[in-house]
Amino acid sequence: MDDAPGASDEAREPLLKRVGASVEGTSLMNHRLMKNPKFRALLVESLMALTTFSFMAKQTEGLAGPELSTLNDCGEAGCGFTKFYQFKGVVGVYAGFWAYTVILIAMYVIRKAPPPGTEFASYALFTAAMATFVVMSITECASVVLSSDYYVCKNADYSLVSLIFAAATIVLNCLTCAFAWRQWGELKFVGLPKTLSALTETYPG
């Protein structure tokens, strides 16, 4: 009976060591993950995308239409973002990209990150869509209404802030694309269609 406590302590020691090793391993993995520049960029991109579509979605009034009929439809308060397909496109694309970044962050955390080629392709497609709608939105924002000192986004602060974050996200995405391309190149562009392989040999990047 007297040996039972000692035997119990001896039995616990291996378990405590395993738990300690597991906690230490998890801490080390998280430390390495946070030192990964691509992962840190991903966190920032996720936050910026969330800010972009949230601010644009908050623009429920204040926008002016370039046509008198639009002004009459919206009244003195002005139009919401839903009256403009360009702004709706920004909300849709950036909301989709934010969802993608959340999934990607989870995959990094569980150490199931996609290959660089997949990341590059997805980032390139999202960035192209972002750039298209942001350019159209900026053009629409700057459109003159009635007089030269009155433009579509003059009283639309949320939209202006949204487009600033949208442009910054595109810049960061381009840097991530370049980083993913370099990683893919180190893997000899595995998975790239043969028709494009000649381009990578000529222009390795």
From Swiss-Prot:
Membrane topology: Multi-pass membrane protein
Assigned keywords, A-Z: Cell membrane, Membrane, Transmembrane, Transmembrane helix
Residue intervals annotated with topology Cytoplasmic: 1-38, 111-124, 181-205
Subcellular location: Cell membrane
GO terms for cellular component: plasma membrane
Regions of this protein lying in the Extracellular compartment: 58-89, 146-159
Main location: membrane
Endpoints of the signal sequence: none
Keyword Transcription: no
Domain of life: Eukaryota
Transmembrane segments annotated in the record for this chain: 39-57, 90-110, 125-145, 160-180
Family statement: Belongs to the Casparian strip membrane proteins (CASP) family.
UniProt subunit comment: Homodimer and heterodimers.
Protein name (Swiss-Prot/TrEMBL): CASP-like protein 0U1
Originating species: Ostreococcus lucimarinus (strain CCE9901)
